């Protein structure tokens, strides 16, 4: 990023999410829990009372389940109110490069049923954006998630006007998150829904992206949420 590469370019080169997934694969469940436990108590020390914790850095059935099991342990062993969010559709792993449809199949046919069988997630999330997952792929995963009782959240409009807001509203997502690139069309769509727009100014600051149009959303009467 310091060298001027975009988020999408970094992902194409195997960095970013994919690099984090490699490191997570090499970390044991107990090791991951100890790291996360330290961060949870740091958050509590800063006054955080509740957190949505996502998976999404496993990108295989085994490692996604590992992350979600750690989240369950944190729920059971800390005073923080935690909701677990299955984000297997965070990126296409290196093993599925050029075979994105097959990875979506894996999420729908193997990951979601396995997550549901163990009761590991409260929500399902998808990174619906340029260079990641399409509106059609997102809709398919949300439909399967709904069959297993997982309400959607969506990563939307971080990198482009992606259609993620509209698909989120269509499937009654609790929230659509990021929204760095949002037009009046998305704002109007949200006005006629029960979906909450969530903006992430820290992402904009860190990645050098536009800031979400919070003032425009508030002026339109939307209840805007902030996240880190």
Task: Describe the role of every protein-language-model region.
Residues 46, 77, 117-118, 171, ...:
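Alpha-helix C-cap/termination motif
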């Amino acid at each position: 990023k310091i060298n001027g590469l975009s988020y999408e370019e970094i992902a194409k080169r195997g960095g970013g999410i994919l690099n984090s997934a490699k490191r997570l694969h090499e970390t044991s469940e107990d090791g991951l829990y100890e790291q996360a436990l330290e961060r949870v108590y740091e958050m509590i020390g800063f006054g955080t009372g509740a957190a949505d914790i996502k998976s999404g850095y496993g990108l295989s059935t085994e490692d996604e389940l590992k992350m979600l099991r750690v989240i369950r342990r944190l729920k059971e062993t800390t005073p923080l109110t935690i909701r677990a969010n299955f984000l297997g559709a965070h990126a296409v792993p290196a093993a599925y490069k050029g075979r994105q449809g097959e990875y979506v199949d894996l999420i729908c046919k193997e990951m979601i049923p396995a997550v549901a069988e163990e009761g590991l997630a409260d929500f399902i999330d998808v990174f619906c954006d340029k260079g990641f997952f399409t509106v059609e792929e997102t809709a398919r995963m949300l439909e399967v998630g709904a069959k297993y009782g997982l309400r959607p959240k969506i990563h939307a409009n971080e990198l482009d006007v992606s259609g993620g807001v509209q698909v989120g509203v269509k499937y009654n997502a609790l929230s659509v998150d990021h929204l760095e690139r949002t037009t009046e069309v998305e704002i109007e769509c949200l006005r006629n829904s029960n979906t909450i727009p969530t903006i992430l100014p820290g992402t904009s600051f860190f990645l050098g992206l536009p800031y979400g149009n919070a003032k425009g959303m508030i002026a339109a009467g939307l209840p805007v949420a902030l996240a880190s």
